[in-house]
Amino acid sequence: MEKRIAICPGSFDPITKGHLDIIRRAANLFDEVIVLIMVNYTKTNTAFTAAERVEMARRVTADIPNVRVDYYAGLLADYARQQGAGGNAVCWGKTNLPH
């Protein structure tokens, strides 16, 4: 059977308890969850650098064995294809849904 991969993309500036809840839920449903720290070009004043956000995400997800954290500055679709996750899932939080 093909590995089921979920990507949880976001700027995670900072990562919150809400983000972590979504990540944990995804980890229960998928074989692998990638927390993808991305660049949000509409956010010009970030509180933390990309490296700091990656480190924070790694720390708070360290106890979840099927989660890994990565950084990507390109398009989500390109990253998903590179990871072999093109046909799998993307996790979105409620704030990302249209009102």
PLM features: residue spans?
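Nucleotidyltransferase catalytic core that binds NTPs
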Residues: M1-H99
